[in-house]
Amino acid sequence: LRAADTVHNGETIMIESGSCCTLLAEELATNRRDVTIITNSAFIASFVRKSPGAHIILLGGEYQNESQVMVGPMVKKCVDDFFVDKLFVGTDGFNASGFMSNNLMRAETIRVMAEKAKRVLILTESVKFTQTGVVSLFPFQNVDSVFTDDGIPSEAAQLLHAGDTHVYTVSSSM
């Protein structure tokens, strides 16, 4: 994972949930030393729990069964004392205004987590750039970098570049 190259041994980061974020957490837990992952995802915490390279801090809150994440005001209380360099987030969709989510509570929780990070990095499959969500997550200007596959539509890449968002692609044939 190209996004894993941005994380160093001994670093503390935040990771929200989603398939790409889970793969990142697995890569870090397997191939980095002393990485602390702060997450609201019970799935990610459980998925990497036996890996010796990662220390997990699971943020508490209201549990959403389908996505296995914690949301709501308790997450805000839990995350308040932290500040990290990077927050890694997935997305459900994209439009000319930015990134989108399909769940209001989850979007609000992600924005709270983003307030405690110097940089926001999106990890997503390129197909999400052809889909929309029901609520706004971030304007693309609030996102430092996007990691996706090489199928990203050129219009989306141009919008991101115009907003000073770095776009990193990997071959979709991998």
Where are these regions (language model features)?
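Hydrophobic/small residue at the entry helix of a nucleotide-binding pocket
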Residues: C20
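Conserved phosphate- and dinucleotide-binding cores of soluble alpha/beta proteins
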Residues: F43-M174
